Amino acid sequence: MAEINGLLEVAKMKISASIKCNTIRGFIGWHSCDNICLDMQDVLDMCEDAFKQERYQESFEADTYVLVSCVKLASYADDSSGMLTDVIIRALKLIDLSTQTISKLDAAMREHALSLIMKEAKKKEFDGWDSWRYELLEKAICLCDEKSAAKLEKLLDTFLEDIENDDISEYQRQEDTVLRYKLHRHIKGADAVKDELYANLDIREMRRIAVKDATNARNYNEAEKLCLEQIKKDDGRFYTNTPEDWNNILFDVYMQSGIADKQIEQAKKILLLGNEEFWDVLKRLYQSQGTWESQKPILLKELKQSKHSECYQSVLVKENEKKLLLESVTEDSYYLFYYAQFLVKDYPNETYELCANYIREQCEQATERRLYKRVCKNLLQLIKWKGNATAKLLVDEFKATYPRRSALLDELQKVEKKL
């Protein structure tokens, strides 16, 4: 029987007390949920310390308790801040660290850890949170031998039966397929389950695994083919700046292949999709070929034509292309008050005029004090840029044009004090 000061018992008492203290009239609001999450992070800190002291089983059991407590809390607490999700992610990482370590220890510890994960994954707390259930079960794969793998698959069968009649079950089915594949791969080896992998390339994670395998084997043509197939399938509907995007994955394949021309081609494509980070990538690639100065104006022109004005304007600031930046914010003034700070020193009159036109339109559309405050905030910014004369002109103009907007006149008085 565990002592009262055992890590798991401490975790139970601390989390229980925190939930009780932060439950108000049966409800756990935003700030209360954050308070509980901070206490859970403290428990995970203790788990990390225990792990460093080689108290692996204690750390693992407490990590798992924190995870299940979080999942239960997610069903009724207000996690608007996202702190609860952060705790879950950290708990899963620590569980993974523990299972990877325990997998190298004696059979009894492996069996205990596997049994605990399977027991916890069955709990109703995970109903409706299948992604976390499958993530937890994935941490158990490294603990399995052929016999225990069969037990894990039997458990997966029961989960699959539960969702057979569920209309919103495709995601769960994919999770099941991926988890089974990883289990089979762990037991049999990658080569033995290659057909299983390629039979499920419609699942994005399976395709990513196939790309990684091909790249590791230096089969860059295969990795390229796998990426291009998915990019074509997406048909331009998806692009994010995350490493998991297929255009970014393809660029990584080209980087590992060492083929400079393809690196440049793909980096340019990603830049023109609006990812400004690839401006520096292209710059380095062109500089290595000694062609940067000739390619730069061509690239700027293409970026301008791509219609990703925010990306284009950000690059112009980076390259100190102030004249082109002035032209760009004249055409598209959405981010004027951010980029004006880079222009006002060299082009004061032009900047003041652009700001004045922007503020006039802003004031014309404003209908309440909250919006009038934004107008006056921009007027005050104009004053900071030494555009006092323009600001005074606008204040006088607004007072004459909108004499019945008492809230506006009230806010304008605050601006006049700064003139």
Feature map (PLM): residue ranges:
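Eukaryote-biased, non-catalytic alpha-solenoid scaffold regions
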Residues: 1-419
